């Protein structure tokens, strides 16, 4: 009987020590001044992604190339933990992001500029576009601590754009096919060549929305007491174009990911 009691007592002591170690771990990797306190996180990251229609329209037959442009984010977040696992955060992330893409298209409705005049019609060939956006994203997130070192956060965000560019040009594809059917799919045929690419009108940025709404999902891993490695995804839910803009016939959404380092204090 004594052996059984000793065994039970030893198990209780072992369980208590494990619990104490777990609590020490939560304290070690928790907010700087306690599990239910808060603080600030300064972030620096590399941004990659693009602005895209979802789903891709049938007119886009093949994506030949895609590359990010810009690619930097600097931000600050404030957070408050209400319990060991749950909290809330809000912040401001300043960014420079953009992309360059090259795609083969067929019967793609587009506005082009020729000799100072805008020509509208349906293009078949290669379409190249580039965009850059400078601004700030303001997220408001719920935070869940999955473990002492892993946090996941999610919630809405608002982006405000300080500066936007959008440019493009069209020309013949690798098979030598490049032409615009003016006004209708069977209209007058105008040839386009890569030796003399035809650009988009330069007023497209004026038709871009100055704000965007979306959902942000973020992961933080505590590498050290004050240092995090993080990744986040900003998925835009609103079209980048003014609703009355007719040159682009489909909605386009900004979808960008950021990876980087953060300092907690």
Please state what every model-predicted region is:
Residues 50-69, 97-133, 161-210, 238-256:
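Extracellular/periplasm-exposed beta-strand and loop segments of Gram-negative cell-envelope proteins
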Residues 1-26, 40-43, 144, 150, ...:
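Bacterial Sec-dependent N-terminal signal peptides
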Residues 221-225, 253-265:
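Outer-membrane beta-barrel "beta-signal"
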Residues 42-48, 90-96, 154-160, 215, ...:
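Transmembrane beta-barrel strands of outer-membrane/channel proteins
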Residues 38-40, 70-76, 134-140, 211-217, ...:
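Hydrophobic, lipid-facing positions within transmembrane beta-strands of outer-membrane proteins
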Residues 85-88, 149-152, 225-231:
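Repeated loop/turn-to-beta-strand initiation elements of outer-membrane beta-barrel proteins
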Residues 21-81, 208, 236, 264:
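Short glycine/proline- and aromatic-enriched beta-strand/turn motifs that initiate or cap beta-hairpins
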Residues 80-84, 144-148, 223-225, 265:
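Outer-membrane beta-barrel strand-turn architecture
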């Amino acid at each position: 009987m004594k052996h059984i009691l000793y065994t039970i007592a030893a198990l209780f002591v072992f369980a208590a020590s494990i619990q104490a170690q777990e609590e020490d771990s939560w304290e070690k990797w928790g907010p700087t001044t306690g599990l239910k306190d808060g603080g600030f996180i300064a972030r620096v990251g590399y941004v990659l992604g693009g602005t895209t229609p979802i789903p891709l329209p049938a007119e886009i037959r093949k994506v030949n190339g895609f590359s990010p442009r810009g690619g930097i984010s600097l931000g600050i977040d404030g957070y408050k933990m209400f319990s060991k696992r749950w909290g809330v955060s809000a912040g401001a992330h300043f960014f420079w992001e953009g992309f360059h893409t090259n795609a083969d298209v067929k019967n793609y409705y587009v506005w082009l500029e020729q000799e100072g005049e805008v020509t509208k019609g349906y293009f078949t060939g290669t379409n190249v576009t580039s965009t850059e956006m400078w601004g700030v994203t303001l997220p408001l997130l719920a935070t869940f601590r999955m473990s002492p070192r892993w946090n996941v956060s999610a919630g809405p965000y608002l982006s405000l754009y300080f500066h936007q560019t959008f440019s493009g040009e069209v020309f013949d594809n690798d098979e030598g096919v490049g032409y615009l059917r003016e006004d209708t799919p069977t209209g007058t045929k105008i040839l386009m060549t890569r030796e003399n690419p035809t650009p988009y009108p330069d007023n497209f940025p004026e038709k871009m929305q100055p704000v965007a709404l979306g959902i942000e999902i973020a992961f933080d891993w505590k590498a050290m007491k004050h240092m995090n490695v993080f990744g986040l995804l900003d998925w835009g839910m609103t079209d980048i174009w003014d609703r009355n803009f007719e040159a682009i016939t489909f909605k386009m959404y900004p979808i960008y990911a950021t990876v980087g380092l953060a300092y907690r204090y």
